[in-house]
Amino acid sequence: MKFYLLLTAALLLTAVIIEAAPTDHQDEARDLMREERDDKSNCPISHPNYCSFTPVCCKHECLSNNKCSSSEFIPGQ
């Protein structure tokens, strides 16, 4: 009987560990986000465009003079 209890506990623990580990799909999605953002800024995903002239993280693309094209920005790092 102890054998079956230990076996059950081991299977449950294995299931929990497997469930908690990130999947390959999650790793691929994370890598794609990094590839899309090739700048070295620490801008969040909500404001992904780093405009270096004013150092801000802009929600929309930067203008040709590297300034934010909208008023939706946060301080860059």
Curated annotation (Swiss-Prot):
Propeptide residue interval(s): 21-36
Signal peptide residues on this chain, from the entry's feature table: 1-20
Pfam families per the UniProt record, alphabetical: Conotoxin (PF02950)
Gene Ontology molecular-function annotations: ion channel inhibitor activity; toxin activity
Any one annotated GO CC term: extracellular region
Tissue expression pattern: Expressed by the venom duct.
Disulfide bonds: 43-58, 51-62, 57-68
Keywords: Disulfide bond, Knottin, Neurotoxin, Secreted, Signal, Toxin
Highest rank taxon of the organism: Eukaryota
Primary localization: secreted
InterPro entries in the cross-refs: Conotoxin
Localization per Swiss-Prot or TrEMBL: Secreted
Record text about domains: The presence of a 'disulfide through disulfide knot' structurally defines this protein as a knottin. The cysteine framework is VI/VII (C-C-CC-C-C).
Protein name as it appears in the record: Conotoxin Cl6.12
